[in-house]
């Protein structure tokens, strides 16, 4: 199977997992990126089975609306049963690196609200140790140099992602060459740097379920 076929398979598996638990009042949290887009397309086939969605980015909101799925502001939603999103890396404990698409802050907020965080990914994203994929950090623009110096102290090689502004108007620094043996600790350390909005480690709040697309079919891992 191609990578696109694996993404479509896990997206459909996520729809199959949540659909029996949805009703006409349900609102679904939706992530950002190519795998999340596959989920949106699959979910749209059942748009009469739930109320609407909360989007983690402007791009996701536009895709949902394009399918005729109502999009709600998170502040107006009191109950979010599911959040479904992809990942750039996952370890066996379902700690994740996310943010390749620069939507990490809103993704992390929606994930924090959701009762169940379902991560969907192809098999290449499962790794023994996080960090081969550079860790994105969302930063207030005036703090860029300060944050970069602090990230060097933590052992990383920070690189400014040129030409990218987040939906929140901030910049992204990608941190290379981190061996992330304690994701929760590193997530806390980086978030404590003045000027950091948040970083792409989802470890304090990891995924609850990982649906992994493999050549043998979709495998389910739980934290």
From Swiss-Prot:
The record's annotation in Pfam families points to:
Rib_5-P_isom_A
Recorded GO cellular component terms are: cytosol
This enzyme catalyses: aldehydo-D-ribose 5-phosphate = D-ribulose 5-phosphate
Class of enzymatic activity (EC top level): isomerase
Concerning its family, UniProt says: Belongs to the ribose 5-phosphate isomerase family.
* Its job: Catalyzes the reversible conversion of ribose-5-phosphate to ribulose 5-phosphate.
Q: What is this protein called?
A: Ribose-5-phosphate isomerase A
Gene name?
rpiA
